[in-house]
Amino acid sequence: MPQKTSQNSLRNVALTASKAYRTKEGITVPEWDGAKVTLREPSGDAWVKFREIVNPQLAEGEEAPTLTEAEKFLRNKAADVVLFIDVLLDENGERVFSDEDQEQVSKIYGPVHSRLLAQALNLGMSQEEAGKP
């Protein structure tokens, strides 16, 4: 039977930043000399930035430009980097990168980063968990 939480205790837990997201701790990254990282699901702010990159706002009557495959790849990579720098945490639960690191991370972003991002995205709530059809 779950332990009953006092109202004050519940409030404190609900206001704890480290408990605002699902996390996956102790992930070993062999390609990074066996470094251990923590991943969390992306924040709402990161999702907004992601969507702004993938679907930039157009002026009224303006059509979205047709992108080449290379342009689509670069756009999608830039959007993924925004999420990646948001979800990668060190063993203490602190972000490894700041938003200012986006350009630097984008230059080296590869399959290892992409696999870690995929794990973080899987922490998000499924439609079944949200009770949606």
Regions found by a protein language model. Name each.
Residues 1-24:
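Extended acidic low-complexity intrinsically disordered regions
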Residues 2-5, 32-133:
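Short, surface-exposed, charged amphipathic helix/loop patches that serve as local interaction elements
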Residues 23-33:
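Short acidic-hydrophobic surface loop/beta-edge motif
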